[in-house]
């Protein structure tokens, strides 16, 4: 027996909204879905030229697409993004919460503004976006959030983003239960060391051991690719994943099994700064 989502995908072109879709994993996913003949909404914050280039590539790959400028760090931006989708498409089949940003600091150096912005950039857009997506998924759909290895392992200076990713994975489980009666599946994809343009920012921070030393300890002996991440997300968006919900799929080449980097790998670089005092 086909689910509502399976029946609708057989009858019409699927509409997929991807935040942060002008580069990296988001762009690769957009092209992957385009090759399936879908309509892709390319959300971007600043670089209109890059977003329009992605739209052109989507159309060359056999799909349809359009770009929407919206800063999802603001509640107004999230609302404007989904208003545009509602006006132009009238419905939504897939919502992929991909955009992310963070500062990388020791916990004792974080100020209230860092915490507020991390919440506003990473967690709130996913929750508010999911609320809006449900209203447009009148016949079932799929929601996928991007997570990372830092949600389950402690990296130097990664607490702020890792904490947000852990929260996202928790929200995925709650949403899966609440949205199931609507025929909507909600999952997360947790990437390890993925060879993307973001890896430079997310990994190369003070206190991390050399990346090659970590790669040598991963069972797969290499970083993942953005295409491997996109293929996993696309699987969760497809009919073959109809009975998967509330889960976090790990794409890390075995990284989390052996759990590097080890503290000993970093040596003195992992030493904590002096304990702050109230007089400091």
UniProtKB/Swiss-Prot annotation:
Keywords: Antibiotic biosynthesis, NADP, Oxidoreductase
Biological process per Gene Ontology, one example term: antibiotic biosynthetic process
Enzyme class: oxidoreductase
Consequence of gene disruption: Deletion mutant loses the ability to synthesize either cyclohexanecarboxylic acid or ansatrienin.
Regulation: Inhibited by the thiol inhibitors p-chloromercuribenzoate, N-ethylmaleimide and iodoacetamide. Also inhibited by various divalent cations.
SUPFAM superfamilies (UniProt xref): NAD(P)-binding Rossmann-fold domains
EC number: 1.3.1.120
GO MF entries: oxidoreductase activity
Superkingdom assignment: Bacteria
Activity sensitivity to pH: Optimum pH is 7.5.
Residues annotated for NADP(+) binding in this entry: 22-25, 71-72, 98, 165, 194-196
Pathway the protein acts in: Antibiotic biosynthesis
Temperature-activity note from the record: Optimum temperature is 30 degrees Celsius.
NADP in keyword set: yes
Residues of the active site: 158 (proton acceptor), 165 (proton acceptor)
Catalytic reaction(s) noted: (4R,5R)-4,5-dihydroxycyclohex-2-ene-1-carbonyl-CoA + NADP(+) = (3R,4R)-3,4-dihydroxycyclohexa-1,5-diene-1-carbonyl-CoA + NADPH + H(+); (3S)-3-hydroxycyclohexane-1-carbonyl-CoA + NADP(+) = (5S)-5-hydroxycyclohex-1-ene-1-carbonyl-CoA + NADPH + H(+); cyclohexane-1-carbonyl-CoA + NADP(+) = cyclohex-1-ene-1-carbonyl-CoA + NADPH + H(+)
Known function: Involved in the biosynthesis of the antifungal antibiotic ansatrienin A (mycotrienin I). Catalyzes three of the reductive steps involved in the formation of the cyclohexanecarboxylic acid (CHC) moiety of ansatrienin from shikimic acid. Can use 3,4-dihydroxycyclohexa-1,5-diene-1-carbonyl-CoA, 5-hydroxycyclohex-1-ene-1-carbonyl-CoA and cyclohex-1-ene-1-carbonyl-CoA as substrates.
Record family assignment: Belongs to the short-chain dehydrogenases/reductases (SDR) family.
Description of how the protein assembles with itself and partners: Homodimer.
Protein name per UniProt: 1-cyclohexenylcarbonyl-CoA reductase
Organism expressing this protein natively: Streptomyces collinus
